[in-house]
Amino acid sequence: VWVNEKGMPEICGVISEDGKSLQVSQKDPLGRGLLWEQDLSFLVVYPDGGTEDVQVSFGKEQASCLKELKRQASEGCFVMPNADGKGYGFFRLLEKDAKACLGNLPACKDEVLRGSLLITLYENLLNRTIPAELYMEAMLDYLPTENNSLLFSAALGYIGNCQRFYLADPEKLELVLWRIVTMAEQSQQRLQAFRQYRSIARSPEAVGKLYALWKDQKAPAGCSLSENDYISLSYDLAIQMPDKADEIVATQ
């Protein structure tokens, strides 16, 4: 299956109704009945903040697995799938788990788990199990708190794609990105945020701000822009400001 067949499994981990076990299932989304043999890690988070790491092993012909929990899960518990980031597949989230995972991103100290959650949440956005508005709101709360450069870059890309794919109101996104451009401690984060801001800016205020910046050739403090950045900015401005397009192109 791993080498010779296309696609990947759809995996879901659900706490049983009695709260005593975690039920993990896999299925072939292409309807061929294929099963993937692999070891998976799930993190059950309890209302008091305690966690339980649940290891699941799928055999060659195994579509589901039931693992008994050490503690009985109650209302408020949720599941973080693929906790070690080693699993292969689309980890479908229940609505309550998706909301909880999004809300817990800023407080998650484990960088591997945080990176895995970013991928899982983004894939659930693309598969429309998470509303774009909910995803964007939570990610914008999380992004300014991320200090890991790789995770920041990944999250920034996911947020930009969400804006482009689902055409959300850009106002809060523009505000958060500009705040990072002007206030982030890491210069690389400032530059990355500026480039994303440039690509998604749609409001008259944001476009006007970029036009003034380009015209004066004056980058925000602590944000070093290259000649290519100004060239790319001129292209975006020419599209956003058609009445000034000829002037912008000629000047650049």
What annotation goes with each model-predicted range?
Residues 1-252:
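Non-catalytic accessory/interaction domains
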